[in-house]
Amino acid sequence: TSEGYGTTDIARVGFHNDCFLASTNDYGTYQNVAIEKSYISQEALFVPTGGETCPPSGIPTASCATADAEMSLLKWTYLNLDYYGPVLEVWRNNSCFTNFQRELGYRILLKSASLKKEATVNGSFQLNTIVDNVGFAPVYNTKNTFLIFRAVSDGTIYKKALNFDIRKVLPVVDYDLKESVSLSGIPAGNYQLLLKIEDNYDTLSDRPEYSIQLANSNTWESSEGLNDLQHTLTIN
């Protein structure tokens, strides 16, 4: 894990499959199929994997279910849209291509939250949520996550850093995001709670297009890159 989350060259090299689901061994991509797929599946917790399709040889075109299972196992992040057209068209015609587009890479979802409605000035607030990743792959780059307190009265924002490492929100595993957040410096009043998951680079942190948008409906504020938790906290 320490090497996988590191910055060495080996921690930055991912995988590309040039003939995905095109033969029993993907045109020679694999020699020991089961062992090598298991290896890639584990490596893909830290580095991206993806590729493109090919004309099938000796096997039928992969079904939607087969492609979905394989992308999930190998934690796919990207798929070439230019090749191989007939395979991609089969997936489009069977109404699974749109799902693949949604699930490639990470897809972070706030599954549930238990949040108190009141807190005391200079006290603390307990953030108690469950986060899911319903995409095929984890987040690979470090991000800075903040709980945002936005005053209902005038829109003033108070930004509190979390210790949350979003890279550890893995596919198909509930992640308990529980942190005690200091309310020091936030005056009494009513506050909307929002979550900002911004880029780690200073030059990109204020650009909303580099912030992570949760997959929940009606929560994204695109102008600022904020996710509305749809909860109001009274500090008194």
Regions found by a protein language model. Name each.
Residues 100-236:
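Extracellular/luminal regions of secreted and cell-surface proteins that mediate adhesion/ECM remodeling
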Residues 57-59, 86-93, 125-128:
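A short linear-motif detector with a strong N-terminal bias
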Residues 64-115:
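Catalytic cores of secreted or luminal carbohydrate-active enzymes
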Residues 1-84:
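Catalytic-core regions of glycoside hydrolase
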